[in-house]
Amino acid sequence: MKTKSTCAQNPNCSIMIFRPTKEEFNDFDKYIAYMESQGAHRAGLAKVIPPKEWRARQSYDNISNILIATPLQQVVSGQAGVFTQYHKKKKAMTVGQYRHLANSKKYQTPPHLDFEDLERKYWKNRLYESPIYGADVSGSLFDGKTQQWNVGHLGTIQDLLEQECGIVIEGVNTPYLYFGMWKTSFAWHTEDMDLYSINYLHFGQPKTWYAVPPEHGRRLELLAKELFPGSSQGCQAFLRHKVALISPTVLKENGIPFGRITQEAGEFMVTFPYGYHAGFNHGFNCAEAINFATPRWIDYGKVASQCSCGEARVSFSMDAFVRILQPERYEMWKRGQDQAVVDHTEAMGPTSQELTTWRVIQAPRKTWGLKHLRLRQVSRCLLPVATDSNIANNTQMCHTSRQAADSKGDEVQESDPAIAPPYPLGLSSPGHMSTGKRGLGRRPCELGVQESTNGAPVKRRLPEGRDDRSPSPELQSQSVTGDLIVNSDLVNPGPQHPVTASEGGLTSDP
């Protein structure tokens, strides 16, 4: 019997802050389930402050030579709190060079009284002095000795993507680093395949986040289509291009509920399935992020919308997740008769049948570990991007009973925004091949242009058969000192720690 229930907690969809004890911090899956039992998922975003004894990395003194292969200058057009963000590819630079640039007079954080004052300056001056973002740097800064909440090895059901299908998509099931400066931004979006994500701010200045509760996500999509009519006509899921910036003032004026919160160094942010989020950096900083999954996500993955124009499409097979964790629905799903209905208020208990099944099959596989890219300090060119033919060949490992099943669709029942009706089967029905294009947008070199692009860089699928723990033959590289990835042994946490709602709370028109 599944321990799913409609969560009565957090009816206001406030962004919650969690402070787990050292014991609670030992079991990632169980603590995420606990957070959802408290209603954290209803906000679409939550903050987790690690125990004071915990450290991600002992020292960041040796990272200045890490290469940012494709820094992106974020150029904005628009007015009155509604902007489109374009990206211009810049020359490669090291983290040390980027830090110097971020702290220069041209790009440094302006004087401000508090976070609210800085936020006003951000939206008032967004059109001026285009910042440069060091985004999508493959690798991890977590020490090998860091076992708890090491984003490079969370041990969630997302591991099935690599273990069952041999699929590795950079930034989805391998970590990415993001080096930011004042005003660098991430536009409104949900995660690819509507996965969860986790973001750890290693060091530097804070990051402000905005989030729309999943049960109100459809309202944001409808507003975005009105504000960006050209983009919406060109792609039914154009928000996946990650180019639309909408200010909190505009959201308020249009009655869109949202929350806001500021992440500081040493804190985690967790986004939940179909949770739209956006934000900006206060100054030079470094964050690390990756996607992950829980059994509650599976039905989201089945119906996740897809970019219809191919600009930022990421899809992969849902077969392994349904076959292994929802065996009673597998045959029906293969016939296209499993019309998933997503309830955004639903919570998955920490003792759910799917989670128990995952732990049983996970135990003998833990010694495998996940493969990850090491950080590059010297680079001659970018990693090759898989072509459509390469992608097709890569996914043959998941044929017959392992066909892709990523559904698309946008309609949500307006009478009850918390319930999403069945989505039409289409490109992501069983039998559709997986693709792996993602990121802030598509890289300029993939679009055939030299300077700018409407989106931002695509997260790359690694070439078939490549052991990404080893350097690519195209790269002359040296790893950062110390192991970056480690297997973690999960143990059950003790009694759960009290939580609080964020100061920002949820904002909407009265």
From Swiss-Prot:
<keyword id="KW-0013">ADP-ribosylation</keyword>
<feature type="binding site">
    <location>
        <position position="307"/>
    </location>
    <ligand>
        <name>Zn(2+)</name>
    </ligand>
</feature>
<dbReference type="GO" id="GO:0035861">
    <property type="term" value="C:site of double-strand break"/>
</dbReference>
<feature type="region of interest" description="Disordered">
    <location>
        <begin position="397"/>
        <end position="510"/>
    </location>
</feature>
<protein>
    <recommendedName>
        <fullName>Lysine-specific demethylase 4D</fullName>
        <ecNumber>1.14.11.66</ecNumber>
    </recommendedName>
</protein>
<dbReference type="GO" id="GO:0006954">
    <property type="term" value="P:inflammatory response"/>
</dbReference>
<dbReference type="Pfam" id="PF02373">
    <property type="entry name" value="JmjC"/>
</dbReference>
<dbReference type="GO" id="GO:0071479">
    <property type="term" value="P:cellular response to ionizing radiation"/>
</dbReference>
<dbReference type="InterPro" id="IPR003349">
    <property type="entry name" value="JmjN"/>
</dbReference>
<feature type="binding site">
    <location>
        <position position="241"/>
    </location>
    <ligand>
        <name>Zn(2+)</name>
    </ligand>
</feature>
<dbReference type="InterPro" id="IPR003347">
    <property type="entry name" value="JmjC_dom"/>
</dbReference>
<keyword id="KW-0408">Iron</keyword>
<comment type="similarity">
    <text>Belongs to the JHDM3 histone demethylase family.</text>
</comment>
<dbReference type="GO" id="GO:0031490">
    <property type="term" value="F:chromatin DNA binding"/>
</dbReference>
<keyword id="KW-0539">Nucleus</keyword>
<dbReference type="GO" id="GO:0000785">
    <property type="term" value="C:chromatin"/>
</dbReference>
<feature type="binding site">
    <location>
        <position position="189"/>
    </location>
    <ligand>
        <name>Fe cation</name>
    </ligand>
</feature>
<keyword id="KW-0560">Oxidoreductase</keyword>
<dbReference type="GO" id="GO:2001034">
    <property type="term" value="P:positive regulation of double-strand break repair via nonhomologous end joining"/>
</dbReference>
<dbReference type="GO" id="GO:0046872">
    <property type="term" value="F:metal ion binding"/>
</dbReference>
<feature type="binding site">
    <location>
        <position position="191"/>
    </location>
    <ligand>
        <name>Fe cation</name>
    </ligand>
</feature>
<dbReference type="GO" id="GO:0140684">
    <property type="term" value="F:histone H3K9me2/H3K9me3 demethylase activity"/>
</dbReference>
<feature type="modified residue" description="PolyADP-ribosyl glutamic acid">
    <location>
        <position position="24"/>
    </location>
</feature>
<keyword id="KW-0479">Metal-binding</keyword>
<dbReference type="GO" id="GO:0003684">
    <property type="term" value="F:damaged DNA binding"/>
</dbReference>
<dbReference type="GO" id="GO:0006338">
    <property type="term" value="P:chromatin remodeling"/>
</dbReference>
<dbReference type="GO" id="GO:0032454">
    <property type="term" value="F:histone H3K9 demethylase activity"/>
</dbReference>
<dbReference type="Pfam" id="PF02375">
    <property type="entry name" value="JmjN"/>
</dbReference>
<feature type="binding site">
    <location>
        <position position="235"/>
    </location>
    <ligand>
        <name>Zn(2+)</name>
    </ligand>
</feature>
<keyword id="KW-0862">Zinc</keyword>
<feature type="binding site">
    <location>
        <position position="133"/>
    </location>
    <ligand>
        <name>2-oxoglutarate</name>
    </ligand>
</feature>
<keyword id="KW-0832">Ubl conjugation</keyword>
<dbReference type="GO" id="GO:0010468">
    <property type="term" value="P:regulation of gene expression"/>
</dbReference>
<dbReference type="GO" id="GO:0000724">
    <property type="term" value="P:double-strand break repair via homologous recombination"/>
</dbReference>
<keyword id="KW-0805">Transcription regulation</keyword>
<comment type="function">
    <text>Histone demethylase that specifically demethylates 'Lys-9' of histone H3, thereby playing a central role in histone code. Does not demethylate histone H3 'Lys-4', H3 'Lys-27', H3 'Lys-36' nor H4 'Lys-20'. Demethylates both di- and trimethylated H3 'Lys-9' residue, while it has no activity on monomethylated residues. Demethylation of Lys residue generates formaldehyde and succinate.</text>
</comment>
<dbReference type="GO" id="GO:0032452">
    <property type="term" value="F:histone demethylase activity"/>
</dbReference>
<feature type="binding site">
    <location>
        <position position="199"/>
    </location>
    <ligand>
        <name>2-oxoglutarate</name>
    </ligand>
</feature>
<feature type="binding site">
    <location>
        <position position="207"/>
    </location>
    <ligand>
        <name>2-oxoglutarate</name>
    </ligand>
</feature>
<feature type="binding site">
    <location>
        <position position="242"/>
    </location>
    <ligand>
        <name>2-oxoglutarate</name>
    </ligand>
</feature>
<feature type="compositionally biased region" description="Basic and acidic residues">
    <location>
        <begin position="461"/>
        <end position="471"/>
    </location>
</feature>
<keyword id="KW-0223">Dioxygenase</keyword>
